[in-house]
A protein has these predicted regions:
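Intrinsically disordered, low-complexity N-terminal regions enriched in serine/proline/glycine
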Residues: 7, 15-19, 92, 117, ...
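Rossmann-like AdoMet
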Residues: 1-11
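SAM cofactor-binding core of SAM-dependent methyltransferases
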Residues: 10-90
Length: 162
């Protein structure tokens, strides 16, 4: 690949690569299974595999982005350790080690008791969710560590305290 990864994914319309070291850089994903809600075109799944993840399962509700992952991204990268699934229903918590959710609005469907099974969880909260969503999320995020705020301050990512 002749261009850097940030430019590659930006040209695909998946302009988040620049965030990954800030959000996920301190995660030890080596030989771990990462479950990800909000996979976009698979750029973060590629990031995790490049950092040594054993396997990544990601959910993405936009079929065009899943197709872009399969057609474009996998033509450049080895995607054999990545499974792309469709829309997350808020009830599916596959076995794994690390759980991340960065899916606009999906965070309000999160079952905080279900994610306790993972070693580490990252939850991204978006400022455009309705008040009722915030009211549900905030009590569950007490004692979680704020690890990232987006450039536009419209998204905050929290890491589980366990």
């Amino acid at each position: 690949m002749t261009q850097d990864l940030n430019s590659y994914f930006k040209e695909l319309g998946c302009d988040y690569w620049y965030e990954y070291d800030k959000v996920y850089g301190d995660l030890d994903v080596k030989d771990k299974v990462v479950i990800q809600v909000g996979g976009d075109c698979g750029s973060s799944a590629i990031y995790f595999v490049m950092k040594g993840a054993k396997r990544v399962i990601f959910y993405e509700s936009d079929p065009n982005l899943v197709e872009k992952f399969r057609k474009d991204v996998c033509s450049w990268f080895d995607c054999s350790r990545i499974e792309a699934r469709g829309k997350w229903d808020g009830k599916d918590y596959p076995d794994g080690d690390i759980f991340t959710i960065d899916c606009e609005g999906c965070e309000v469907s999160l079952d905080f008791s279900a994610i306790r099974k993972y070693q580490i969880c990252l939850v991204s909260v978006h400022n455009w969710i309705p008040y009722e969503g915030w009211a549900k999320l905030i009590p569950n995020l007490v004692n979680w560590k704020l690890v990232y705020g987006s450039r536009d301050s419209k998204e905050l990512t929290f890491r589980s305290p366990w």
